[in-house]
Amino acid sequence: MHRLGRLFCFFAVSVFCNLSTREIQADGLNDQESLECRDVWEISTRHLMDRPRCIDPIDPALRVHRFDTGCWQEATIEDALQLDGRLPIVYVHGNFMTHDNARRRVLLIDDMLRARAHRSYRLIMLSWPSQREPHPLRDTRENAASSDSHSLYVAWVLQQLRDAPQVSLLGFSLGARSISGGLHLAAGGTIRGLHGATGVNTEPSESLVRVGFVAPAMDRTWLTPSGKHRLATQHVEGILSLYNSDDPVLRRFRFLESGSHAIAAGYQGFVGNSLIRQYDCSDCVGRTHDERSYFRQCPYFGLVLDHLLWNESVGACRIQ
């Protein structure tokens, strides 16, 4: 059965890649036009404290750049988060990402979104300090704590976008953890005592939100009615999550949460929330925790892209 699953994934990925290539070619965009049409932004906290307890709600001192004609150029937060009719898609990367790698990753995601998009969008990456250090387990624990604290910035960004009719969020690994925490804080929840000092406006949002998680490094119970991020789904229209029951990193997730028997949602899937559609990608990606393996080898990632783009056909193209 495992072999049949891998054969299915190989066939599905081939079809997915061929369709994507044809769609790009049909756009008639040469390389230069492709660069000029990008609307990709970076909001960075890499120059700030790793694990903030609070942020300034008026001016959180974020650094902003826009990818324009082949290079990253300085911009303002007002420009990055303006509501101009385009669909805002916010991406939060995972662990052990240098600044340059994060920038390359968001451009790769933009390529895949553009191949399936039927509407204009604005892709905004929240880049946080997650580079690799000499001690992997200790550094992963520190970055997990940092991703929890950076939920404050996700919540702040969501509040700036609160008047957008639709918002999409994509997170990989610890980035998914930041997104879930940010949604929880924006809805009035608390994490490690942060809420009282955030200054985040928790008035009801006008936005409908769609979320895509890839290998989420968070406990599978956190989105249950009594979970740590229980308010995260308050304004969420739907969550599509990809996990890998062969993930060698998330299999050891319990070591991140000291004194617990936690099981990662990216390893065994979420429990206790009917808003979540999820797929086990182990037959496709195998023993890895590499985000790019989901992009290249998992046909279900196409569903995530459609979900984030609010494509009308997403309900009809589910892969069972």
For each feature predicted by the language model, list its residue ranges:
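Bacterial N-terminal signal peptides that target proteins for export
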Residues: 1-9
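Loop/helix-junction capping segments adjacent to catalytic residues or to phosphate/diphosphate-binding pockets
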Residues: 99-100, 177
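Lipolytic serine-hydrolase domain surface
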Residues: 27-82, 95-97, 103, 107, ...
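Gly/Ala-rich beta-loop-alpha elbow adjacent to hydrolase catalytic centers
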Residues: 171, 175, 179
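Bacterial N-terminal signal peptides
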Residues: 9-18
